[in-house]
Regions:
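Single conserved hydrophobic/aromatic residue that forms the stacking wall/gate
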Residues: 1-12, 222-223
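Composition-driven recognition of long, C-terminal low-complexity regions enriched in serine/threonine
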Residues: 4, 49-52, 183
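Short conserved micro-motifs on helix faces and helix-strand junctions that flank
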Residues: 4, 68, 73-74, 134, ...
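Flexible gly/pro-rich beta->alpha loop and the following alpha-helix that scaffold active-site loops
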Residues: 9, 13-73, 79-93
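Amide-donor transfer/coupling interface in amidating biosynthetic enzymes
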Residues: 18-21, 25, 58-65, 95-221
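Beta-edge loop/turn motif
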Residues: 76-77, 137
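Short, glycine/serine-rich, charged loops/turns that create anion-binding
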Residues: 77-79, 190-191
């Protein structure tokens, strides 16, 4: 999904591959979950290949991430895509990868994350908050080759042991963004946790129409 100057639209990968879409008029793109290519080649590997090995698609995406007026979010499969394309820490000589959960199985669960001090456009105002959220992935482990201070970690699982940390991610990482704070990746599905009735547990004394996660998307719209 992409959000342009006059609203939102579906921006299909095939349009980028064919050169029909260049992202020039787009300011916000979301790469979302969905087990692209059925994960036959590994998580988001086939999806990433469509960008890596197609000149038109690669140019469109590279130009988008080079611009200073853009935002993006990669959720689950989209997180795996942005990490596979090395878009979050482009200056690193060794890049983090998304690898198999330590449990060696797919994990679908309701857990919680604690938002760290961060400069993320979408989540900086959440600093110190602990919020419930769904996860659903088989390759959700952030395998990070450098020390923690080399990464802009936005959110961590509230507890570092399984099953609260469902994948064994290095530094308990659940969410990360680039140095500018404009490009966010998250394995937890914040978009599946928008409504209180999405949550496995929601405080009964609260009568919210939306969960706090909606604010992240509101902030992205305000920014652009």
């Amino acid at each position: 999904i992409s959000i342009g100057l006059v609203g939102s639209e579906m921006c299909i990968r095939d349009s980028l591959v064919a050169g029909r879409e260049t992202l020039e008029n787009i300011q916000f793109i979301g790469a979302v979950g969905g087990f692209s290519n059925s994960d036959v080649l590994g998580s988001a590997k086939g999806w990433a290949g469509a960008f890596k090995y197609n000149e038109k698609a690669k140019k469109a995406l590279d130009n988008f991430f080079t611009r200073k007026d853009t935002l993006s979010i990669g959720i689950c499969n989209g997180c795996q895509l942005w990490m596979e394309l090395e878009l979050i820490n482009p200056n690193h000589k060794r890049h983090g990868k998304m690898t198999f959960n330590d449990s060696k199985k797919h994990e679908s669960a309701f857990t919680s994350v604690k938002i760290q001090k961060n400069n993320s456009v979408m989540l900086s105002s959440f600093e110190g908050s602990t919020l419930g959220v769904w996860v659903s992935h088989g390759e959700g482990k952030f395998s990070l080759p450098y020390n923690e201070n080399k990464y802009n970690i936005v959110g961590k699982y509230s507890y570092d042991k399984y099953p609260h940390n469902p994948n064994g991610s290095d530094y308990n990482t659940a969410m990360m963004c680039d140095s500018s704070g404009r490009h966010l990746v998250t394995m937890p599905h914040i978009e599946r946790s928008i409504f209180p009735w999405n949550w496995a547990f929601y405080p009964p004394d609260r009568k919210d129409k939306f969960s706090p996660w909606i604010i992240a998307f509101e902030l992205s719209l305000i920014h652009i």
